[in-house]
Amino acid sequence: LMQEYGLEFGSQQGAGNCCANGETGAKEALTRIVNKIGDSFDNTDAFMHIATVGGGTGNGSIPYTIKQFKNGFEDLTESPSQEWMNSVIHTTFAVWPYYYEQPQRHFNAICGLSRLLRNEDGSQNADLVLLASNSHLSSEDAGGNGQYDSVNSAVIRAVDMMIGAGRETRSVIDIKDYVTLPSQMDAYHFTPAIATDLNGDVYELDFMADKAAENTFVPLELGTSSVVYMIVRAPESMIDEGDITEPEVYKAYQKWTDKHDINAAGQATLTPKPGRGENVDVMLLLGGFDLNPLLDHSWDQFDQLSGRLTDDEKLPQARLDKIQTNIEDYVKKNSE
């Protein structure tokens, strides 16, 4: 895949861990980026952008590239985009730096999340922003094993279950379902919570949802969620034999949200996986929750650096102020 689709861009070797340089690199190479995408794909419904928001290149380039797609490539002068590109849905998976990492990475993370959520004028940028925290996923409390691979595996597992819900389900949750209502609610940040290989002959579905909720990808208070999607993946044999049914999944979804006093919009779906057995997987996509438990790990570092970046790295103060205002406004709205 890297050999076939990879594209190097920008005038520097990396972005020097500065998101502003990453954006500049994407702007310099926008024509090449768009042409490469057009040469590689004839059409698609959605893009999934994945970035460690503590870094510079992906963190700087992805919010800019999404904005260009959604605003008709206003910076594109050398070649036209293809018509299908104007209607693509842009989802992102933003991976938060380890809490112990250097202040620059936490500064970048705040800036990156703000720019994924909001354009400078305060309008929505990405259609959906999924969040994962390296430290939270790697902690023993979250069921991790402290290894980098555990974070990568968790992200891959979440994406696979999201895609499966729109591909092989009895009741489809497709990409438009994930983004339409949350965008209307101005609550389009999410995090997965997953439990796998639960014995479907032993455990009730609402208990399985509780086990999934123990494994959120970021720290949060469940009761602050305003959107919840529940995806249950069970062996085909269990579904065909009526051991797990869609009405039971819907009932479990309602029972679980009621139990946790979550007055949430959302959907539930049942999707098959090949083979026999009784091992069931459950994923909750929790959206619109209070972001403060995550951002509290980074605000001090952001404040520490925001006034004293070196000249070649510094964002214009007016833009930095807007970045901060945008994320503060979004967080406040979703914590009330």
Question: Where does each model-flagged region fall?
Answer:
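Tubulin/FtsZ superfamily GTPase core signature
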Residues: L1-E336
